Amino acid sequence: MSINNYIVIFLTIITFLGCKQDKSKAKLPVEELQQNIEIPEAPEGMVWVPAGIFEQGAVPQDQTAMQHEKPRHSVSLDGFFIDITEVTNAQFSKFVEETGYKTIAERKIDWEAMKSQLPEGTPKPHDSILQPGSLLFKKSKSTVPNLYDFSQWWEWSIGANWKHPEGPDSSIKGKDDYPVVHISYEDALAYCEWAGRRLPTEAEWEYAARGNKNGTIYFWGDDASELSKRVNSWEGEFPVNNTLEDGYERTAPVKSYPPNSFGLYDMAGNVWELTSDWYNLNYYEELAALKTTTKNPQGATKAYNPNNPYIQEKVIRGGSFLCSDSYCASYRVSSRMGSSMDSASEHVGFRTVATPEMLMNQ
């Protein structure tokens, strides 16, 4: 098999992107805390999202919604704190300096672990391919006839990682306030453990992203003409021509666009954000079938994606600088996608949450 074919196999394994679960500690009951104690002051860089009930999933007027965003279903959530912005390079740098942590993109690829996620008999790629690296976006030189063939705009770059977000010759110098990228699920969990935080559930993420606009397509309403003023996304023909109406070709510094009604920035576009939920194609249908309000849902019990049957995926939310109306339009607040737990790319990052319970028990 040629090296090019190995690369295609490799891309197939890791493209849709993002370990063990957080270790439990002795905890106070969440409901008791939220009912009987004063909510503590928000930690620096976070805001309080009050408890409430909302309808999760695509709204009826959203004509671009995908089937796995439906049907809408009722969810009840306790209040929680959430980061105002995506975790930045400066914040992640502090974590690495204090712990010496190495991200998955900085580690040599473990073929034995990888082949367990591949069809039996898949040959081992050449060692020159199994080197530390990550996925980079590459602009196409001509119109792409098949937008399902993601290998046309992604390439494996040895040496790409959070410190070198656009390849081995790039750096994050002068980009302290940009979102950290090339982060896998495992990397995000490690940061959370250090920071005394956790990843949001998918329901928490959408509730926070919607703010007080429960019945709209976007976090600001239904007017798509507002997109370039509010979101770092791809404008023009994807993946050929980005007109840069929003001012940025790739990631943008956090807080570059107006926040939502909760004061949260970049809940649409810039980078996809990891959540704690397993990605399961049928999960929304299962919740809706209960015909009741689900309290504090923790996601599906197992991953299920028939398009990636060998991959364990977590849900990512919010879309990225690559989302466009001609491709995925994932800056819509109900948009969701599966992300391989053990891979990373230049358009995936994360933000964290905390509860009064977590803060009281630290």
Predicted regions: what they are:
Residues E346-N361:
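Short, structured beta-strand segments at or near domain termini in extracellular proteins/domains
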Residues S24-P40:
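N-terminal pre-domain segments of enzymes
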Residues L17-G18:
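C-terminal motif of bacterial Sec signal peptides marking the signal peptidase cleavage site
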Residues I84, N89-V96, S184-A190, E206:
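Short, solvent-exposed alpha-helical surface patches in non-cytosolic proteins
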Residues Y6-I14:
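Sec-dependent N-terminal signal peptides
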Residues K23-P29, V49, E55, V59-P60, ...:
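Functional-site microenvironments in short loops/helix caps that host divalent-cation chemistry
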Residues F54, V59-D78, P168-S171:
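Short, conserved catalytic-motif segment at the N-terminal edge
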Residues F80, F95-I104, A195, L359:
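Short capping motifs at secondary-structure boundaries
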